[in-house]
Amino acid sequence: MKLETEIVNEKQKVLIVSKKSYQFLDYLKKCLKKYSVDVFVSPNNPGNLHIFDYCFFINEVPPLAQLKKSATFFIFFFINKKHLSLSLFKNLKKYKAIKINNENLNHNEVDRILWFIFSQTQEKVLKIDTVSPQLKKNVTLTPFRLKIKKLSTKKNLIILGFSLILLLHFLFIPFLITSSFFTYLSFQALKKEQVESSQSNLDKANKLYLLTKKLYSFSRPTLLFFNLALLPDSFIDIDLSSQQLVNQGIVLLKNGKEIQKIIFQKNKTDEEILELKLRFVKLHQGLKTISDQSLFLAQKINFPLTFFKKFNQQLLDYSDLTGKADKFISYFELVFSAKEPKKYLILFANNMELRPGGGFIGSFGILTTNYFTLDDLKIYDVYDADGQLTAHIAPPKPIEKYLQLPHWFLRDSNFSPDFLEDYNKALFFLDKEMGMTNFSGGMIITTSAIENILSVFGNLYLPDYKEYINDKNFYLKTQLYVEKNFFPGSIQKKVFLSSLIDQIFIKAENISLAKLGLAIKKSLDEKQIVVYLNDDKIQSLIDSSYWSGRVIEPNCSSPQKNCLIDYLFPYDANVGANKANLFINRFFNLKTTVDSQGNINHLFSLSYINSSPGETFPTGYYRNYLQLLLPLNSKIKSITKDGVLVEDSDQKDNLYKTIGFYFEVPPKKTVEIKISYQLGEKLTGDKLYQLIVQKQIGASNSDLVLQFSLAKNVTLTNHNFSPIVKDSEIVYNTSLSTDKIFLMELNKYE
C-alpha cells in the first residue's frame, strides 16, 4: 500500500475592528493577504479574540480583562487622539500601538506601520505625522524650498535615505571605540594602583558603553540578518567584561588596603577581628572572580594583531597570578588565625656566602603571632646563641676539613640541601644554646629575598644611622655597619637589622600590598625564602607549591605511565669564609646520549666565573665544596676540572647517590667542571622519561642547557617543554630559577 504525505499550511487569522471605513484599510488588507493571511473585518468587538493571531483595533480599546486572558497579539491604532495615555497597556506583553495625527495615510506610511508591527524591535509605540491634502494645496514654496524640491528627486532621496540608514546602523562604532579606550585607561591606572583615576575613567567608559548598547539595539537585527553581528557582539561583550574586571580590581584593591591597616594594629577589638575575617572572605571571592574573568576575556580576545596578543598574555598572567595569590593568602590566613600565641623561627642567611641550605646564618629572629596579630619580631645575632654552646657537636667533614672548625654551631647548621633537615638541626642548636623550644614553624630568608622585599618599600630612612636604605644599597650598607670591625658578641648587627625591621613595620601600612605579594612570591618561587610549618594541613599546601625547600623524592609524576626516573641536584658550599658568591656566575649544561641499546649516558658541565676584583675580603678566591645528588643506580665514569681528572672525591649512597669534591676558582678566572656518569636503568620500549633538576636554596638563577642525542631506533613522541629539534638532536635553553621537571615520551625499537 502506497502512503502519501500531505502537507497542510495553516493560515494565520487577522481581525480588524473599526467602526469607520478608513481609506487606508483597503491597502492594509491587501498587504496582509499577500502573506497568506485570512483577514476578517468587523465594526464591533466579536468577543472571541483568542481564535485570532493578530487583532487590529482602530480608535477602540476592548476591556483590559479580555485582553489579559488572550494570547493574541494586539495592535491599536489611535487617530487624532492627542491626549491618550498608554499606561493602561503596561501589563500587556504582546501589543503595539500606532499614533496617527491624520487618517489620510499613504502607501509608504502603511508599509512603515506593517514593518513596525512585524519586526523584532522592542519599541511598543510608533508615531506617524501626516499632512492633510488641503494644507498641501495652500503651501507657497519659497525660493529655498523650490531649490530643495529640485534636489529632492527620487534618485537623490533614495541615495540620501540609504546613506542615513547606513549611518544609523554603524553609529555605535565610534562610541564603542571610545568606551574601550577609557576602559583601557582605567585598567592601566589600576595597575599603578591609582584608584581615583581608574574609577573616573571607568565611569566614563560605562556611560559610553550604555549609549553604545542603545545605538546597537537598532543595528543588531539588520546585522544579524546579514550574519554580520558576531564581531560587534564580541567587541561589546569584551568591553563589558573588561569594565567588570577593572571594577572588581578596584573593589579588591580598596578591600586589601583596609586589611593592610587592620593587620598591623595591636590589641584588636572583637569587632576589628570580625571585620578582618569578613574582609578576607571578600578578598578570596574577589580574587576568584578576577581569575575567572581574566581567563574568560583571554579566550574572547583571540585576534591575530600584536596588541591583542600582548593583552591576551597579560590576562592569562593575571588569571594565573590571582589564583596563586588566593592560595598564598590562604596560607597567611591559616597561620595567623590561630587563637593561641604562636612562635616562628626566622633564619637570616647571607647567600653571598652560599651554603647547601641557603647561606651563612648571621642572624635569626623570633616572630610571635596571636590571633590575626603580628605581636613581635625580635632579632638575635647568631653569636648570641653560639657563644652559649658548651657541648661539643661534631661538624660535617667538609666544615671540619675546609673551614678548619672542630665544633659545629647554629651559624653553620644548614649544611643539608633539604630545609626540613636544616630546620630541625637549627632547633637542636637553639635548644642546646639558649633553651628555646616550642616553635610552630620556621623559614629561611636570604639576602636576595630581603632585597626583593625592600624594592617595594623604596627608600627607608634609619634615624640612628642617618642613612637611606633600599634594595640597591642594602648589602653594601650591611657590610659597612655589620661586618666592619665585627667580633663575636658585638651587637652592631642586631641593632642595625632591628632598626631596619622597625622602619619596615612603620611603612608597611602604606606600601602596595600587591607589589609586596609579588616580591614575596618571587622569593618563594626562586627558593630565596623556604618555609616549614608544624601544621600538616598548611604544610601540605606549601609543599604543593614547592615552597618548602625539600629534596624531591624519586617518584614518577604519572603513575599510569611506564616511567624512567632521572634526577640532578648540584649545590655549593662556600668554605672560603668570604662573600665571593656576590661575584660568581654559574652556567650548567647537561648532555644526554641514548644509544641503540637503551643506555643513558650524561655529561654534566658546570662553568664557574669569578669576577671578584681581587683577593681582599669580602671578595677573593671561591673555595667551593660542590656536591651533586644523582639517581642511586648511577655509575660515575669521571670527574674533571679544566680537563684534569679529580681524584679526591667523596661518595655515599642513601636515597640518592651523593658526589662531593673541593675546588677553587681564583679571582677573574673561569673553571669548568665535568661529571660523566651513566644511569643504571636502560630505556626499553615505550617509556616516560622524567628528569628533575633542582635548584639550591639561596643560589642565584643559572643558565641551563639541555642537549639530548637519540639513537636512530629511539624516537621522541611527546614532551612538556619547547626544545629545538633537528633529526635526533634536541636542544633546550632555560634558566634554573626554580625546581624544574622535564618529561619526554620515548620509544625504543628493537
List each model region and its residues.
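Non-catalytic, solvent-exposed segments at the cell envelope interface
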Residues: K2-K11, S18-D26, K30-S36, P43-F52, ...
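Alpha-helical transmembrane segments and their juxtamembrane interface "caps"
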Residues: K13-L15, V37, I165-L167
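Secretory-pathway-linked proteins and extracytosolic
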Residues: P46-L49, K740-E750
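Juxtamembrane membrane-insertion context
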Residues: V139-P143, N733, T738-K740, E750
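Hydrophobic membrane-insertion alpha-helices, especially the h-region
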Residues: N156-P174
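Charge-rich, low-complexity terminal tails
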Residues: L476, L710-N713, F721-P723, Y749-E750
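Solvent-exposed, conformationally flexible loop/turn segments
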Residues: Q597, P666-T670, D686, V725-M744
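A surface/secretory-pathway sequence property marking extracellular, secreted
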Residues: S634-D653, T715-I741
